């Protein structure tokens, strides 16, 4: 099976950069800072594949670079090096970092969906939940309003939102309901890839479990590829067949999730595993 998405040698630097941190083998010091110029090395030399229908997990502590990688894939974070190859454009396999503005919008609005930990990043709080999801179809040039409304309502039912709450504004939803609306918005245009950036962070444990169950059932039902970012390695274990462990902007370990968690080779991975068990 050919990859849906291939990330090669991805690099993101915050700051002016220098020959050292912009080179092929930067040496970040404490807090991911370049010891020469002080720029932040958010991620460097990040390489991995995502296959159709799989759920890939990226785990690491705050500042490890995992959310930066998602932003680069979603084309909302400019990169300093590398390539991201995507196979589902009509023109064939393309490096999406080099596409024009129109193709970029097509990727963001149709091919990819994203769910943020902070719902304010994913939802417009000045329009209804129904409007948030319908708006994404309008951006994708859907103009049959009756069909849009029917599809939105069907999807809301799929993510277990009561029809009585369709027209409520996001501010009036609970945290779990806000995440359900984000999930509906991410799915509405039948994307090939869903990006999940700590989607259960900050939620009560019982609500977290329900959202994770929803994500797992959607993955199985729709066979859509997902990249799940989390600091909680047990959340990754629940959803993901393969895992990437990041530290200081680099991938330090990867493989089948059960293998990595049951027999971690790196001390940092061992710490992540033990911290969630305790």
Task: Show the residue positions of the predicted features.
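ABC ATPase NBD Q-loop/coupling interface
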Residues: 83-106
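Helix-to-loop junction immediately C-terminal to a conserved catalytic motif
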Residues: 74
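Conserved ABC ATPase "signature" region
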Residues: 26-28, 146-164
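ABC ATPase "signature
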Residues: 254-255
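A short, surface-exposed alpha-helical micro-motif characterized by mixed small hydrophobic
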Residues: 236-238
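Conserved ABC ATPase signature
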Residues: 169-173, 177
């Amino acid at each position: 099976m050919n990859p849906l998405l291939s990330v090669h040698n991805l690099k993101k630097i915050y700051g002016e950069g220098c020959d050292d941190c912009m080179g092929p083998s930067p040496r970040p010091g404490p807090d991911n800072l370049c010891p020469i110029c002080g720029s932040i090395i958010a991620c460097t030399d990040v390489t991995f594949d995502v296959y159709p229908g799989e759920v890939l997990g990226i785990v690491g502590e705050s500042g490890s670079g995992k959310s930066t990688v998602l932003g680069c894939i979603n084309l909302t974070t400019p990169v300093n090096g590398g390539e991201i190859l995507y196979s589902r454009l009509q023109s064939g396999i393309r490096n999406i970092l080099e596409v024009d503005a129109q193709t970029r919008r097509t990727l963001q609005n149709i091919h990819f969906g994203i769910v943020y930990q902070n719902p304010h990043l994913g939802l417009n709080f000045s329009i209804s939940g129904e409007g948030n999801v319908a708006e994404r179809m309008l951006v994708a040039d859907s103009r049959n309003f009756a069909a849009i409304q029917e599809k939105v309502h069907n999807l809301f039912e799929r993510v277990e939102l009561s029809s009585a709450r369709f027209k409520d504004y996001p501010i009036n939803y609970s945290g779990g309901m806000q995440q359900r609306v984000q999930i509906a918005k991410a799915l509405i245009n039948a994307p090939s890839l869903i990006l999940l950036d700590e989607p259960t962070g900050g939620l009560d444990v019982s609500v977290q479990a329900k959202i994770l169950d929803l994500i797992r059932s959607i993955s199985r039902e729709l066979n859509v590829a997902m990249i799940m970012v989390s600091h909680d390695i047990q959340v990754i274990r629940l959803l993901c067949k393969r895992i990437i462990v990041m530290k200081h902007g680099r991938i330090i370990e990867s493989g089948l999730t059960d293998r990595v968690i049951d027999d971690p080779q790196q001390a940092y991975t061992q710490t992540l595993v033990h911290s969630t068990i305790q």
